[in-house]
Amino acid sequence: MQSAMFLAVQHDCRPMDKSAGSGHKSEEKREKMKRTLLKDWKTRLSYFLQNSSTPGKPKTGKKSKQQAFIKPSPEEAQLWSEAFDELLASKYGLAAFRAFLKSEFCEENIEFWLACEDFKKTKSPQKLSSKARKIYTDFIEKEAPKEINIDFQTKTLIAQNIQEATSGCFTTAQKRVYSLMENNSYPRFLESEFYQDLCKKPQITTEPHAT
């Protein structure tokens, strides 16, 4: 995708040709670039679906994994636009949204949210404590490898809470990240060409009868 974007920048920097033929060629190049970007997006999603796993759940065989990520019908995909929760509840939708966030370089938001969902289901106090520290070092502390964008007061509160970890350690931060995704990334995902393509109903072509 980066190479395609670089080509787009190169194209925009070239001097404009005033001839009609040049304008037609420019339009063709833009359409070709859009198709390339969409193809690359689909490739990324396909790879992601084949190599992703939900936190806290054991990996299963190839057959069950393929069944879990069956491409939705246009009607099912359209349901994702009704509410953000509808998108997150779909395994394919969640994987598609993660791939989209990865393309926007903000995948840490959904990863943090999923880690919190897994954390809240943890029953063992020992596991709760170790998971809390891992989430803190991965997403919360300053210069964490996947640092999320939350305010200093919330970070300080979390640092205090994980000393005696409870299932509500990250509730405030999770709600803020959820709101950020719902109000920013989610609308952009719904406008993406990939999502629009999923919602398109296949055109039925009828072959002419032989005479």
Curated annotation (Swiss-Prot):
GO CC terms, sorted:
cytoplasm; cytoplasmic side of plasma membrane; cytosol; mitochondrion; nucleolus; nucleus; plasma membrane
Region Necessary for membrane association, as annotated, extends over: 32-66
In UniProt terms, what is the effect of altering S90A? Answer: Near loss of EIF2B5 binding and inhibition of in vitro translation
Q: What is the effect of changing W41D?
A: Impairs association with plasma membrane
Query: Quick one: where's region Necessary to inhibit protein synthesis?
Result: 79-116
One of its Pfam families is RGS
Q: What, per the annotation, is the impact of changing C106S? A: Changes specificity and confers GNAI1 binding. Strongly increases affinity for GNAI1 and GNAI3
UniProt subunit comment: Interacts with GNAQ. Does not interact with GNAI1 and GNAI3. Interacts with EIF2B5. Interacts with PRKG1 (isoform alpha).
Q: Which PROSITE patterns match?
A: RGS
User: How does it get modified post-translation?
Assistant: Phosphorylated by protein kinase C. Phosphorylation by PRKG1 leads to activation of RGS2 activity.
Give the protein name, as stated in the record. Answer: Regulator of G-protein signaling 2
Q: List the disulfide bonds.
A: none
Instruction: Quote the annotated effect of M5L.
Output: Loss of isoform 2 expression
Question: Which keywords, in A-to-Z order, does the entry hold?
Answer: Cell cycle, Cell membrane, Cytoplasm, GTPase activation, Membrane, Mitochondrion, Nucleus, Phosphoprotein, Signal transduction inhibitor, Translation regulation
